[in-house]
Amino acid sequence: MSLDAASHQPAARRLLDSALVRRVLACMIIVIMIAISIWILTYVLFL
């Protein structure tokens, strides 16, 4: 029944997908920033 409702509402599904993509992109950006900051810290410590 819920699958039927979801199939009849493509706009909501598209909105959910875009929100999920945005959340994944934000997580990736945060992880990349943390990795770069850690790399800079180790570079400064071992300089």
From Swiss-Prot:
Bilayer topology annotation: Single-pass membrane protein
Listed transmembrane segments: 27-47
Tree of life domain: Viruses
Major localization class: host cell
Keywords: Host membrane, Membrane, Transmembrane, Transmembrane helix
Presence of keyword Membrane: yes
GO annotations of cellular component type: host cell membrane; membrane
Locations listed in the record: Host membrane
Protein name: Protein RL9A
Lineage: Viruses, Duplodnaviria, Heunggongvirae, Peploviricota, Herviviricetes
Protein encoded by which gene: RL9A
